[in-house]
Amino acid sequence: TEAEKKMVEKVKTAFPHVAVVLNVGGMLDTSWFKEDEKISAVLLAWQGGIEGGLAAADILCGDVNPSGKLTDTFAGTLEDYPSSESFHESLDYVNYEEDVYVGYRYFESFPQAKEKVIYPFGYGLSYTTFEISVKDLKVEKDKVSVKAEVTNLGKRAGKEVVQVYYSAPQGKLGKPALELGAFEKSRLLAPGESQTM
C-alpha cells in the first residue's frame, strides 16, 4: 500500500541498510523494491503464523540459514500476470484464462512473459553457496531418475533444494515449456560437505 511504501521511505532515511519483510499471502508488485539500492534485502515470510516473527528474526539475525525457495514467480507488476484481469470478477469462482500455463508455467513458456520476471519460481538465497552436479541420469520406459550431488562451497552450514525440471514433447494440446518434475532438500551440510540425492 502507499502507507507501507511511505513507512519504508522513512526507514530508508534513518538507516544505511534496510531489509523488507513481506508478510503476504499472494503476488504483489515487486517493482518498487527490486532496483532500490537502499533496500539491502527482502525476506518473503509468507504467512508464518504465530511463530513467523521469531522465524524471520532468526533469519535476519543470521541464527538460521534460509533454504526456502519461491513457490511462485514474482513479476514486476500485477498486470504482468495473465490472471490479474479476471481474478476478482467473482468471489466464488476463478476462471484461469491462462489454461495450463498457470503460474511459473506461463512465464517459462512465453518469451515476452519471461522478460517480466523479477524473481523466478524456485528462487531462493542462502548465507552460503552450493554447487549442484548431476551424477547419474537414467531413462527407463516412462521413468526418469536423476542423482545429483550437492556440495556446500561456502563458510556456513546450510541446506539446498535440488530442483528437476523437464520439457514434455508438444502434442495436439499445448504444454508448458518447462515443468517442475521433482525436488528434494538436502540435510544440513557443513562447509565442504556433500550429499548425493
Annotate each predicted stretch with a short phrase.
Residues N23-K159, Y165, P191:
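Secreted, periplasmic, or luminal enzymes acting at the cell surface/secretory milieu
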Residues K172-M197:
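Intrinsically disordered, low-complexity Pro/Gly/Ser/Thr-rich segments with frequent PxxP/GP/PP motifs
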Residues E2, V11, E97, G103, ...:
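Generic low-polarity alpha-helical segments
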Residues E9-A19, L54-I59, T77-P82, F183-S186:
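Low-complexity, flexible helical/coil segments
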Residues E35-K38, Q163-K172, L178-G181:
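Active/binding-pocket-proximal capping segment
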Residues T1-E37:
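Hydrophobic helix-and-loop "lid/oligomerization" segment in the mid-to-C-terminal part
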